Amino acid sequence: MTVGLFGGSFNPPHGGHALVAEIAIRRLKLDQLWWMVTPGNPLKDSRELASLSERLRLSEEVAEDPRIKVTALEAAFHVRYTADTLALIRNANPDVYFVWVMGADNLASFHRWQRWREIAQNFPIAIIDRPGSTLSYLSSRMAQTFSDSRLDERYAPVLARRMPPAWTFIHGPRSSLSSTALRKVQLKKAPSKK
């Protein structure tokens, strides 16, 4: 079985996230995609973070494909960092082929993640195109550090079975939706407190 692991704050989840998930399922030939809603992101301000239960509920609404399984694995495992979550998932599922799925907009800061090199050395990574990231991804530290491990996207269907480090950049339809922009719109609509 091949499973994509797609983690994020999803604050809020939106059609752009669903598009990334659908592209990953189709292009990577995944049996399932685990949409992993994190309790929080150590690199982001948590003051605007909706509750985990709310983000899970909204993710369930956005993720319509039955192959997408919305989870709160980090909360269940009581871990904070992706590297720890992925190690626990792999240990609990030794017969599953996993691939880490991320939107290209996250690639610029991937080198700031706790033990990011460990993630890249232990999991194949699929980077899905996002607006404004198509060309800039090449200058990211991850792309430069692991340039010899990049696969042409035509090999995306076999990525999950490749020995890491291995990664690919997948082009395709892009959504301009952004959680940050959606939160700003919500703040403008919210009644002011006087």
Swiss-Prot record:
> What is the documented function of this protein?
Catalyzes the reversible adenylation of nicotinate mononucleotide (NaMN) to nicotinic acid adenine dinucleotide (NaAD).
Keyword terms of this UniProt record: ATP-binding, NAD, Nucleotide-binding, Nucleotidyltransferase, Pyridine nucleotide biosynthesis, Transferase
Q: Which GO terms describe its molecular function?
A: ATP binding; nicotinate-nucleotide adenylyltransferase activity
Q: Which InterPro entries match?
A: Cyt_trans-like, NadD/NMNAT, Rossmann-like_a/b/a_fold
Reactions catalysed, semicolon-separated, are: nicotinate beta-D-ribonucleotide + ATP + H(+) = deamido-NAD(+) + diphosphate
Q: List the disulfide bonds.
A: none
Q: What is its EC number?
A: 2.7.7.18
The first-level EC class reads: transferase
What is the organism field in this record?
A: Brucella suis biovar 1 (strain 1330)
GO biological-process terms attached to the record: NAD biosynthetic process
Q: In which pathway does it act?
A: Cofactor biosynthesis; NAD(+) biosynthesis; deamido-NAD(+) from nicotinate D-ribonucleotide: step 1/1
Name this protein carries in UniProt:
Probable nicotinate-nucleotide adenylyltransferase
